[in-house]
Curated annotation (Swiss-Prot):
One of its GO terms (molecular function) is 1-(5-phosphoribosyl)-5-[(5-phosphoribosylamino)methylideneamino]imidazole-4-carboxamide isomerase activity. The keyword Amino-acid biosynthesis applies. SUPFAM superfamilies: Ribulose-phoshate binding barrel (SSF51366). The active site is at D10 (proton acceptor), D129 (proton donor). CDD domains: HisA. GO terms for biological process: L-histidine biosynthetic process; L-tryptophan biosynthetic process. It holds the Pfam family His_biosynth. It catalyses: 1-(5-phospho-beta-D-ribosyl)-5-[(5-phospho-beta-D-ribosylamino)methylideneamino]imidazole-4-carboxamide = 5-[(5-phospho-1-deoxy-D-ribulos-1-ylimino)methylamino]-1-(5-phospho-beta-D-ribosyl)imidazole-4-carboxamide. The keyword Zinc-finger does not apply. This is 1-(5-phosphoribosyl)-5-[(5-phosphoribosylamino)methylideneamino] imidazole-4-carboxamide isomerase. Keywords: Amino-acid biosynthesis, Cytoplasm, Histidine biosynthesis, Isomerase. Pathway: Amino-acid biosynthesis; L-histidine biosynthesis; L-histidine from 5-phospho-alpha-D-ribose 1-diphosphate: step 4/9. Its EC number is 5.3.1.16.
Length: 241
């Protein structure tokens, strides 16, 4: 088995964008979200990580647009951003997305999140957005508690998968936080998807080396948009690792 590659399409104000360290105002615009996702699909990606940044920041919604993107793609989609209650969860699942990511709600409404983990199993992943050993919530604008305490609670609730993002790395192309990923994997038996900082094929090889300890996939965004490597090159590197 090789790591799963999830090219990222982050959407703000109807456009595909990339942020630096999650900071509002740091957007680089890349155009139509469907065109971006379709390009990754044509290059061989089997998953797309699709994010509604406006919903994540609590400043609006691109729900209809994202639902249309999911419908028009032929690959599996992990949908993220603003999923905080039953209504938003049901709407996200109703798009046909293979999996949804819950971030802020895991911190702000633990009882709801624990119930959802038990009820939906593999269709829900928990996004752990980390700065140091502190979690960030609400589009990374608020602190959300101690990473290890929250991870232990989510494990007890039966969380099936974690998407771990080092916020200080995200959108910077400075390399992933391998130490953080190793430590998370050591503390949970659930699979982990790595996100943040991936900039080279060597970074992908380093992440592939963590597959035996629990890393299952990798989200790549800015490196693909910036042309650091292609989806085809990334898939080949992961297959050969």
């Amino acid at each position: 088995m090789s790591l799963t590659l999830l090219p990222a399409v982050d959407v703000a104000d109807g456009q595909a964008v990339r942020l630096v360290q999650g900071a509002a105002g740091s957007e680089t615009v890349y155009g139509d979200p469907f065109d971006a996702a379709l390009a990754w699909q044509r290059d061989g990606a089997e998953w797309i990580h699709l994010v509604d940044l406006d919903a994540a920041f609590g400043r609006g919604s691109n729900a209809e647009l994202l639902a249309d993107v999911v419908r028009r793609l032929d690959v599996r989609v992990e949908l993220s951003g603003g999923i905080r209650d039953d209504a938003s969860l049901q709407a996200a699942l109703a798009t046909g997305a293979a999996r949804v990511n819950i971030g802020t709600a895991a911190l702000e409404d633990p009882q709801w999140c624990d119930r959802v983990c038990g009820e939906y199993g593999d269709r829900v992943a928990i996004g752990l957005d980390v700065r140091g050993q502190t979690l960030s919530a609400r589009g990374w604008t608020r602190d959300g508690g101690d990473l290890w305490e929250v991870l232990a609670r989510l494990d007890r609730a039966g969380a099936s998968r974690y998407v771990v993002t080092d916020i200080t790395k995200d959108g910077t192309m400075r390399g992933p936080n391998l130490g953080l990923l190793r430590e998370v994997c050591a503390r949970t038996n659930a699979p982990v998807i790595a996100s943040g900082g991936i900039s080279t094929l060597a970074d992908l090889r380093a992440l592939a080396a963590l597959e035996p300890v629990g890393v299952e996939g990798v989200i790549a965004g800015k490196a693909l948009y910036a042309g650091a490597f292609t989806v085809a090159e990334a898939l080949r590197t992961l297959a050969d690792a």
